[in-house]
Amino acid sequence: MTRIGFIGLGNMGGPMAANLARAGHAVRVFDLMPESVAKAIAAGCIAAGDAREAVTGCDLAISMLPAGEHVRGLWLSEGGGQDLLGALPAGAQVIDCSTIDVASARAVGDAAKARGIRFLDAPVSGGVTGAA
């Protein structure tokens, strides 16, 4: 079973995480909004106390955040960021589904590559209906 960490459970991320849990994956989730986490738990996800706990030791980490600054702040150490790439083992995969600027995606991708982590910039389309 793939261990998945999922950060960002809004209108798009929440249904995506729920689909992964329903497919039988162990999905640890985190969001700043407790009600979003509660919905994910009801769908079979496992709550993490913070973003680092959600991704630590995972084979696959997925983020779905509002803007490039949030994605950089999550994965990188620049400007006091959380540096969550450091919580992943070499060989792990990060998929960022946020619709962000190219510079942010490249910055995270380059940092991931330097640590032996695969990065996929995968902005989503289809809206909330497609995510469900």
Task: List each model region and its residues.
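Short, well-ordered alpha-helices that flank and scaffold nucleotide-derived cofactor binding pockets
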Residues: A18, R22, L76, D110
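Short beta-strands and strand-loop turn motifs
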Residues: F30-L32, D96, D121
